[in-house]
UniProtKB/Swiss-Prot annotation:
Keyword check for Calcium: no
Name used for this protein in its record: Sexual inducer glycoprotein
Role noted for this protein: The sexual inducer is a glycoprotein synthesized and released by sexual males at about the time they release sperm packets. It is one of the most potent biological effector molecules known: it exhibits full effectiveness in converting asexually growing males and females to the sexual pathway at about 10(-7) m.
UniProt-annotated glycosylation sites, renumbered to this chain: 89, 119, 131, 139, 146, 188
Annotated source species: Volvox carteri (Green alga)
This protein's record includes keyword Glycoprotein: yes
Signal peptide residue numbers: 1-11
Keyword annotations of the record: Glycoprotein, Signal
C-alpha cells in the first residue's frame, strides 16, 4: 500500500488515486489537509512522490539525520494538469512541516537518480507563513526528475515523524507537494493567474 492525494473534491482525487495505484504510487487514508495553501489545482501531473521514504547516511552522522522522498513518473494520465506543456516540468517541491520544528531543518538535499550520496547537492530551505518548506527553481524534465530524491537534513534527534505536519491524522508520514511553477498565490488573493498552476500532494512513509 502506498499513498493518497486529497482535497475537498474527494471523487476527483479518488480517480487520481486509482491512476497512481496502477504505478504503485497511491494508497492509504483519504484525509484533507490545508496543504499546500496556494491557489493551484491538486490534480494529476506527470510527477509523483513514491510512498516509501528512506533514510540515508548523512554527511555528518553525529549531528544530522537524512530522510529522502523519491520522485516517480506517471506514464499515463489525462486532464489539463497532466497534458498541458506547462506541466511537463517540475519546478518546486514543498513539505508540510510543524511550526515548532522549523529550526530543526538544516538543509534540503537533491540527489539525482543513480548518483552516490556523496554527490548530494545541499540547498538552504525556504519557509512561508503556512508551514511549508520549499525548494524551487528545479525545472526538472520527466527524465531528470525520475528517480531523483528530495531530502530533508534534520538536526538530531528529530525524525521526519516529528518534523512533518499531519493535522492530527494517524500514521507516520509526510505530505509532499509537487508544483509546475515557482509561484504560490495565497488562497484569498485576488491576483489574476495567467497560467494553470498544478500542485498534487502525496503521503510518503518512512520505510522500516
Amino acid at each position: 500500500m502506498a499513498v493518497v492525494v486529497v482535497n475537498s473534491a474527494t471523487a476527483s482525487l479518488l480517480a487520481v488515486c486509482l491512476v497512481f495505484m496502477a504505478v504503485g504510487l497511491c494508497t492509504g487514508q483519504i484525509v484533507d489537509v490545508k496543504f499546500p495553501s496556494c491557489r493551484c489545482e491538486r490534480e494529476l501531473t506527470p510527477f509523483a512522490i513514491k510512498s516509501a521514504a528512506t533514510q540515508l547516511t548523512s554527511r555528518n552522522p553525529g549531528v544530522v539525520n537524512l530522510y529522502c522522498f523519491e520522485i516517480g513518473i506517471v506514464n499515463s494520465g489525462s486532464g489539463a494538469c497532466y497534458t498541458e506543456p506547462a506541466s511537463q516540468n517540475l519546478s518546486k517541491v514543498s513539505v508540510y512541516a510543524q511550526a515548532a520544528q522549523r529550526d530543526r531543518l538544516s538543509a534540503f538535499g537533491v540527489l539525482l537518480a543513480g548518483a552516490p550520496v556523496s554527490n548530494m547537492t545541499y540547498l538552504t530551505p525556504r519557509w512561508d507563513s503556512l508551514n511549508m518548506t520549499t525548494i524551487s527553481n528545479l525545472n526538472f524534465s520527466k527524465t531528470q526528475a525520475n528517480g531523483t530524491r528530495i531530502c530533508l537534513e534534520l538536526f538530531k534527534p528529530t525524525t521526519i515523524n516529528e518534523f512533518c505536519e499531519r493535522e492530527g491524522a494517524s500514521g507516520s508520514f509526510c505530505w509532499v507537494a509537487l508544483f509546475n511553477d515557482n509561484n504560490c498565490v495565497p488562497p484569498n488573493s485576488t491576483v489574476v493567474i495567467s497560467k494553470r498552476l498544478c500542485c498534487p500532494r502525496f503521503q510518503s512513509f518512512l520505510s522500516p
